[in-house]
Swiss-Prot record:
Ca(2+) 2 binds at D469, M470, D472, D483, R484. Belongs to the venom metalloproteinase (M12B) family. P-III subfamily. P-IIIc sub-subfamily. InterPro entries: ADAM_Cys-rich, Disintegrin_CS, Disintegrin_dom, Disintegrin_dom_sf, MetalloPept_cat_dom_sf, Peptidase_M12B, Peptidase_M12B_N, Reprolysin_adamalysin. This is Zinc metalloproteinase-disintegrin-like agkihagin.
Amino acid sequence: MIQVLLVTICLAAFPYQGSSIILESGNVNDYEVVYPRKVTALPEGAVQQKYEDAMQYEFKVNGEPVVLHLEKNKGLFSEDYSETHYSPDGREITTYPSVEDHCYYHGRIQNDADLTASISACNGLKGHFMLQGEMYLIEPLKLSDSEAHAVFKYENVEKEDEAPKMCGVTQNWKSYEPIKKASQSNLTPEQQRYLNAPKFVKLFLVADNIMYLKYGRSLTNVRTRMYDMANILNLIFRRMNIHVAVTDLEIWSDKDKIIVQPSADDTLKSFATWRESVLLKHKSHDNAQLLTGINFNGPTAGLAYLGGICDPMYSTAIVQDHNKIHHLVAIAMAHEMGHNLGIDHDKDTCTCAAKSCVMAGTLSCEASYLFSDCSRKEHRAFLIKNMPQCILKKPSKTDVVSPPVCGNYFVEMGEDCDCGSPATCRDPCCDAATCKLKQGAQCAEGLCCDQCRFKGAGTQCRAAMDECDMADLCTGQSADCTDRFQKNGQPCQNNNGYCYNGTCPTMIKQCTVFFGSNAAVSQDACFQFNLQGNNYGYCRKEQNTKIACEPQNVKCGRLYCTSPEKQNPCNIYYSPSNEDKGMVLPGTKCADGKACSNGQCVDVTTPY
C-alpha cells in the first residue's frame, strides 16, 4: 500500500476576537481570527500534490487546542464527470474537467471517531466541524491579509427572519403502505444479498438560470456553491452506507430549459419530464436534482417523488437555494434525496442523536446530519421491497486514480477491503488498520460473499432483467457477481431487434428517445442522406473526417425519425458538442439477419 502523505498545518489563533462581522455565511456575532500556517514534510522523492490526500489542522478554539484530521473525499466525483453550460446564443458547451486533484475533504476532530467535518480547501479553508457537540464554521476573511480566517459557532450566525421552510412532499408518487408492510416479512436470500451490497447514487446536478444570476453570472461561483453542498450531501449519506458521487453539473447560463415557477409541483413535473426526455440521453445517472433560486409558494423549500430512485422520470427532486449557509441547503438536498430513496417524513416519535433529524417535515436551523431510527427502518423496507438496481453499480478499483488511502471506504489498488477507520469499522471480515482481509476470510463484500466466504459455484447472485440478459451466477472463486447476457445476434423485441451486449437496441426505441413517444422511424429515402458524408449523414469518422456510408450501410449512419410534431419527414438529432449523438447505435438491426457494427451492416452470425 502506498504511504499517504501527511501534511500538518498549524492555525495559530491570535488573541483577537470580533464582536460582529458580515461573512459569506451571513451576519456573525462573536468570532475568532486564526491564521493558517502550512508545514509540509514531504518524503524523499515524493511528488507534491496541489491538494494532499490527508491533512491535519491544529488550532485553538476558545483557548483550547484542537486537531482536525481531514481526508480528501476522493469519491465525490465520478471518473467521467462533466460540466455543461450554454453560450448567450444557446449553444451547449460541455467540458470534462480534471477533478482528480480536487479540494474537498471530510474529517473529524482528534479523539472523535465520527466523521463530522466537511471542508473546502480551494481558496483558504471553508466549512464546518463538530467540537464537543457544537457546530463550528470556518471561512476566509476577505482582507488584504489573505491568511486570516474566522472561526465561529454556528449558533452565532444570525438566522434569517422568516417562516420555517418545509418539504412539500405529501406522498406524491408511490404508495407508501406496501413498503411498510414489506419490512415485516422474512427476507429471501436475494433480498438479503441486496441489502448487504454497497450502494452508490450517481447524481446529476442542475443549477437554473436564477442561480446563475444570483451568483453574479459566474460559472465559478455557481460551481463552488454546488460543490460545497455536494461534499456535505456525500457526508450525510455515508451514515446510511450510501455513496453519493456527482457525475455531472449543468448550469442554465442562457435561459431555463423548463418553466421554473413558484409552484413546486409544476416545476418538479416539468423537471422530471425534461430529465426523462432530454437529460438521460446525454449521460447515464441514477438521480437528478434541480437547484433553483426561485421562491416557491408558501414555506416549501423542496419537493421530490417518494420512492422514485432509478425511475427514468421519478428519480428527481427540486430544491430551493433558500439560505446563505450552504450546509442548510445541503441538508434540504439530502432530505429530498431521502424521499427518492423511499423515506417519508419523520413522525413525532422518531428520534436521532440530535435536536432535529434529516427527514423532519420542517427544515430545522439546527443543521442535523443524522437520519432517525424511523428513516433507517423505512429505507431498509423500501430496499427490501423494490431492490432498485441502478444503485448497485460502483466504480472499479482502477477508476480511483489517486493514491489509496486506507479508511476512506473505497477499495483501491493494493487493498482487499476498506470499512473506514478502526473506530468506526463494523465489518467482521476486514482489518480496518491494514485494509486487508482478516485471517481465514475470503472476502468482505460483494454479491457472492456470505459471512466472509465465497458463495458456492452456480449460486444465483442477480436475476435476469430482460430477454437479452441472463441470470448471473457465482463462480465459487470470487465475491464478484459477473454480468452475463445472451449472445449477440439473438432475436429480441418480437424479432424487431437483435441482442447486443445485454440490450435490445432498435431504431424505433432510439427515435422515441430523441423525439417523444409518438415518433417513428423515417422512410428509407431519408437514410440516403447518409451517402453525403457531412453533419447530416455519415457512417464513421477517420481523423475527424466524416466518411459517407456505402449504399448497403445507410441504416448504420445518422438516425432519421419522423414525428407528428415535426413537419419534416426526415428529422435528425444533432449536437455540435457531441456529433456522434444521434447516430444509429451499435447492434441495431439494419436488415433481416444483420446488425450495425462500426458503421457497417454486418451479418449477425459473424462476431460484431
